[in-house]
Amino acid sequence: FIKLALGENVKQANRGYYERIRCPQTRMGVEQVFYDHFLRARAYEQEWEKYNSLSLSEKRKTQAPREDLEMNTLVEILNKERFITCHSYVQSEINMLMHVADSMGFTLNTFTHILEGYKVADKMKTHGAGASTFSDWWAYKFEVNDAIPYNASILADMGVVTAINSDDAEMARRLNQEAAKAVKYGNVSEEEAWKMVTLNPAKLLHLDDRVGSIKSG
């Protein structure tokens, strides 16, 4: 797995008097950073493919491309060998990153927090992304003002694999209560609500063959 991030967390990392010339400063800048790095990774992969296609005698006369651990990681993403979980809130940014992923040929595994997921649930289903969201957090910063307690149920109704997360050590002890809010607000069945804190997180982590559910015997 690898974690990416969108929104104010990314922009504010470069905020301050001495950091005003750094990129990204805008959401458009964040998008460009993603494209720049993935395009570099694609070119890096092609360099290695070209080198590896040489015969042994040709390799002895040719300098190998420089090993770049950052590009190796991005190539793994492009080749669907590494899963992405992405911090997100706003629908425009969620759409943007799915567009980047679609254009580069990979799939986003999970959007975390994703409090505007209900606005793009159909697009997430089409793309193949899952959701790990808060039950009813809202308005703790400007970009989450549109959060609603029906988010998890709407995502689940659209066929998105949906989990409820805590982001808090104390709340993690009471995820059953967080799941119950999906029953209260979204009319989700108790079984589906339990899946949001058991089986569905296991699916998003690709561990559902080992944890997340129980069977007779």
Q: What kind of region is each of these model predictions?
A:
Residues 1-108:
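Polyanionic/metal-chelating signatures
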Residues 73, 93, 119-120, 151, ...:
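Short acidic active-site motifs
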Residues 83, 125, 129-138, 142-217:
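His/Asp/Glu-enriched, well-ordered alpha-helical/loop segment
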Residues 85-90, 107-116, 136-141:
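Catalytic beta/alpha-barrel core
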Residues 91-95, 114-121, 171-172:
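Active-site environment of divalent metal-dependent phosphoester hydrolases
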Residues 98, 117-132:
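Feature captures the catalytic cores and cofactor-binding loops of soluble hydro-lyases/lyases
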Residues 108-116, 120-121, 190-198:
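A generic structural motif
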